[in-house]
């Protein structure tokens, strides 16, 4: 059984958006292949939420800026003794390639927005019980198509997000690897520190304590309060050790 639980908390709006997009894209593939109504609604609800997130900000612009920033950071390691130069060069080329694909791709999510079935389901998702067969006969007949036909369509939908997924995965991997975990100790369930212009907090907490962190703050300063899962009987120790990375 896993004994450590990893919590991540964004320290700015762009990271909040990126983590939400990453989560929703991961959810798209959880229940594949789509074989029933429940699986279909899970998939289409996540597609709809993804499109909502895309409409709230300049996702492509922010990602392109971050790809450039990561390239500049890596270039400072070129020629440094003891650093794997081939690895640095390979990462820089991967970042450049991801940026080229992203900048030449159509508007993010446009292929999904223009799909008739997705549009029909999105219109009904906010209505309680609004995806019944009599409300959405199109979805009903789609669910009775051969499995291979549905699978092919779903793969095409997901593939339309590949330029975004590739760039986002690279950016988040580099950010997560940018800082090591360090042991910290909270006093009476509280801990605060300077963020040092970090984008993301990563926190490892022992499952044995059955505590979770409530995190507030921004890139320059943050605070963590540890709360018991059992609000009536749970207790927070006077001193609590945990691991923290400011990425």
UniProtKB/Swiss-Prot annotation:
Any Pfam family: ZapD
Query: InterPro entries per the record?
Result: ZapD (IPR009777), ZapD_C (IPR027462), ZapD_sf (IPR036268)
GO terms for biological process? division septum assembly; FtsZ-dependent cytokinesis
Subcellular location(s) per record: Cytoplasm
Record's keyword annotation contains Amino-acid biosynthesis: no
Q: Whom does it interact with, and what assembly results? A: Interacts with FtsZ.
Name it. Cell division protein ZapD
Q: What is the lineage of its organism?
A: Bacteria, Pseudomonadati, Pseudomonadota, Gammaproteobacteria, Enterobacterales
